[in-house]
Each structure stands twice: as structure tokens, then as C-alpha cells.
């Protein structure tokens, strides 16, 4: 199943769920803006708890901006942020190829069975493919992410820069065979955050 199949399948599933009245709230997915940052951070705190910044994935995100055009939020009818996902540029080991690291993916914990997480995933994968990226990696639960094509099959020789459970390092090839032979520890890449300048003392 290729990326377009994921999108079509996901749209069909959402249509069926909507006809059954299973979707609890309407939402749209848009590009994240600077104004969304406080709401996004508050949502992540609620959904993932205070230890989220200690995860090994955070070492690859710290001090970096998301990959260009790959930061999204879900909004409800009032415009409030109800979900978030971002993707980050990484390098596969020393002198390795480039890829994306997806995460964190989070949905407002008060909203259940609305399809927000799945919609964010499918949108993110489709945009990553459209922008020409070759592979997406993440650390997460295989039973959930397998539905989007992720598996640990191609990550056996790859590692995160910190403690993690190896079986939870998953990958999706957007270009077939691009992860063949990939090995080493993932390294942060992409755009760095600009350091804030402190005002000079009088």
C-alpha cells in the first residue's frame, strides 16, 4: 500500500464513521502558526505529562525548528487547537541519508474517537511525500502506527541518541528501499532556533 492508498483509505474510514455518528466533533487540519504555540504546549502537557521533555526524541528536537511546511494542528469549530503533530529533519548516522522524525503526535485527552490523530498522521505523511522526503521515523506503539505503514523492519541498525525501547523505533519508507543499509544513531538536522538576545544593561 502506498501513501496515496493511506489517504484514500483514511478518507473512506472517516466517511463511514461519520455516517454512523461515531465522530464526536468536527475539525480541520491547518498549518501551525506562532499564535498556536501556547495552546500546543498546553495540549502536550495535558496529553503527555511533565516527563515529555525527557524523552530521547526530544534530544533531536531541542533547539531546532520543525521541517519546513511540516507542523500541523487540528482545530475544532471554534478554532481551538485539539491536536498537533510536527516532523523534524534528521540524519541517519554519520554521513547517512536524510529522513524525518515524526512527533509528538497528541490529541486533547478530553476528545475521544474523533479521528483527529489518524487524520493528522495521514495529512503529515501525505505532505512529507509531496515535499519530496524519502522516509519518516518515529518512536511509538507499533499496533497503532502499523495502520499507517510503519514498522520496525528497517530500523534494526538505527538508534536513538538516548534511552528508548528498540522495538518502538519505527519507520515508513516514502521512497521504496531508501532505508536499505541505513545504520547509526539519528542526529538532529535542519533549521536551528534563533537564540534570543538579552537586552544590554544600562
Model-derived regions, located:
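Conserved glycine-rich acetyl-CoA-binding loop
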Residues: 80, 94-95, 108-119, 131, ...
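A contiguous, mid-protein "functional segment" used to position or interact
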Residues: 152-184
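Conserved beta-strand in the GNAT
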Residues: 71-73, 80-91, 98-106
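Conserved active-site alpha-helix within GNAT-family acetyltransferase domains
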Residues: 130-134, 139-165
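Short amphipathic alpha-helix that is part of the acyltransferase structural core
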Residues: 3-7, 12-59, 65-81, 95, ...
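Conserved acetyl-CoA-binding loop-helix of GNAT-fold acetyltransferases
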Residues: 102, 107, 113-126, 138
